[in-house]
UniProtKB/Swiss-Prot annotation:
One of its GO terms (biological process) is regulation of translational termination. One of its GO terms (molecular function) is translation release factor activity, codon nonspecific. Keywords: Cytoplasm, GTP-binding, Nucleotide-binding, Protein biosynthesis. GO terms for cellular component: cytosol. Residues 8-268 form the tr-type G domain. This is Peptide chain release factor 3. CDD domains: RF3, RF3_III. The keyword Endoplasmic reticulum does not apply. Its main location: cytoplasm. SUPFAM superfamilies: EF-G C-terminal domain-like, P-loop containing nucleoside triphosphate hydrolases, Translation proteins.
Length: 514
């Protein structure tokens, strides 16, 4: 098979949702259809002992939540599928946002009883900003939920995207009978031995069923007043195909997968800082690091840099340019993933995600190229933390483990590190409280380094240039610190303290990140 044909087989997407909408469960079912797991297990909390394949970190298994992005790959129906299962918890939106830079499409999972929730809306806005296609799976039809028409209306009003139902539920909860498949023009049956039936058989199968009569009325209304189906509008991110189903009972998931692969896009090009778009079919390899993960194998205290291949082909042992440093690197120890398990890979192509063993060479956002190509891809989003804690080792004899743990976990980008200019104290910044809990848990479990964490409350953060810096600017209402890149930064007590500082030093430029 030619390189072009291999690249065109790839389908790389992320699954996004609010916590508990069923995102990890649908991931399990997709892996089941891809033959990667023998049984799609229910995602449960710590008492059951049954863990999701994509939840590999110890704390994820204990709490039944996803706190880090997982990468999984399988072959299905002639396509090579790369799934990125992202954290649903809002505290880990930073990891999720960066992951969304590495995909060509998104699958949005919505709880049929709750509709569009806060985290779903936030993540959708990032996807919308990138104009990548969004496929919607409305989940949990095995439970009572809201009316389908009401859910479609909310999609359009809250998210501002047109929708087109690919199927329609027949009943819901205990009265759930199946799906009226508009795309494949058939019925998918929830009960009984037969999985499918013709639409012509519907009146006989559901005679005297009030739900089926309502379905026919809804579909007639949609055909008269709903949006037209347009493959181009889907690819442009202007129309979301909507699928109904139940991930828990594995109903409607395979139909979703088949139809998704029919319309999901091939790998797309990525913009450089100069505004050029790198074509995925270009033979020269290029890629970017969108994530760094420490201790995927706790026995080896390793670090993996996750790279999205943008163009060309990776071959084991190839030399690459690291544009940020201007230095070369050799890609010898490279893997692909099934959550925490991995296997060495000798080649991969545009659209694939590979893991490069990292000894501290790479940073999130790094561009890798070959030959004389020295461009950089557009930077990944960075976020200003909102809450802070001082951190120190509980046992001074564990200083070495403490520093190693902080260094590795900070390089993952899940938490940010600052050092007080005057005292040298370490301060951690996060988007949400759960990040601190995970940090503490991982420091103790993975590095055997207990930590003392002292809350500092919320702070308003602004960066300042070295040229403007004067240590006398520090006061009781702000803390002068350095970030992990040694850039000076002020942590202001509140917005009032920030305004007071800006009035006192009008010539000083204060920079805010995302």
């Amino acid at each position: 098979m030619s390189l072009t044909e291999e690249i065109k087989k790839r389908r790389t997407f992320a699954i996004i949702s609010h916590p508990d909408a069923g995102k990890t469960t649908i991931t399990e079912q997709l892996l089941y259809f891809g033959g990667e797991i023998r049984e799609a297990g229910t995602v449960k909390g710590k008492k059951s002992g049954t863990f999701a394949k994509s939840d590999w970190m110890d704390i994820e298994k204990q709490r039944g939540i996803s706190v880090t992005s997982s990468v999984m790959q399988f072959d299905y129906a002639g396509k090579r599928v790369n799934i990125l299962d992202t954290p649903g918890h809002e505290d880990f939106s930073e990891d999720t946002y960066r992951t969304l830079m590495a995909v060509d499409a998104a699958v949005m999972v919505v709880d049929s009883a709750k509709g569009i929730e806060a985290q779903t809306k936030k993540l959708f806005e990032v996807v919308k900003h990138r104009n990548i296609p969004v496929f919607t799976f409305i989940n949990k039809l095995d439970r009572d939920g809201r009316e389908p028409l009401e859910l479609l209306e909310e999609l359009e009003e809250v998210l501002g995207i047109a929708s087109y139902p690919m199927n329609w539920p027949i009943g819901m909860g205990r009265a759930f009978e199946g799906l009226y498949d508009l795309h494949n023009k058939r019925l998918e049956l929830y009960k009984g031995d037969e999985r499918f039936a013709s639409i012509e058989d519907g009146d006989q199968l559901f005679a005297n069923n009030p739900f089926y009569e309502q379905v026919k009325e809804d579909i007639e209304l949609l055909q008269e007043a709903g949006n037209d189906f347009s493959e181009q509008a889907i690819l442009d991110g202007d129309l979301t195909p909507v699928f109904f189903g139940s991930a828990l009972t594995n109903f409607g998931v395979q139909t979703f997968l088949d139809t998704f692969l029919e319309f999901a896009p091939e790998p797309h090009g990525h913009k450089t800082t100069e505004g050029n778009v790198v074509d995925p079919l270009t033979k020269d390899f290029s890629g970017f690091v969108f994530k760094i993960q420490a201790n995927m194998d706790p026995k080896h205290r390793d670090r993996i840099a996750f790279v999205r291949i943008v163009s060309g082909e990776f071959e084991r042992g190839m030399g690459v340019n690291l544009t940020r440093t201007g230095k070369g690197a050799k890609l010898s120890n490279v893997t692909q993933f099934m959550a925490e398990s991995r296997e060495n890979v000798t080649n991969a192509v545009a659209g694939d995600i590979i893991g490069v063993y990292d000894t501290g060479t790479y940073q999130v956002g790094d561009t890798l190229t070959v030959g004389k190509n020295k461009f950089e891809f557009e930077p990944l989003p960075t976020f200003t933390p909102e809450i802070f804690m001082k951190v120190s080792p509980k046992n001074v004899m564990k200083q070495k483990s403490f520093h190693k743990g902080i260094e590795q976990l900070v390089q993952e980008g899940a938490i940010q590190l600052y050092k007080n200019y005057q005292t040298g104290e370490y301060m951690l910044g996060a988007v949400g409280q759960l990040q601190f809990e995970v940090f503490k848990h991982r420091m103790e479990g993975e590095y055997n380094a207990e930590v003392v964490m002292t809350p500092m409350g919320k702070k308003t953060v602004r960066w300042i240039s070295e040229d403007d810096l004067d240590q006398h600017m520090s006061s009781s209402r702000n803390i002068l610190a350095k970030d992990r890149f040694d850039q000076p930064v002020f942590l202001f007590e509140n917005d009032f303290a920030l305004r007071w500082f800006a009035d006192k030093y009008p010539d000083v430029t204060l920079e805010e990140k995302m």
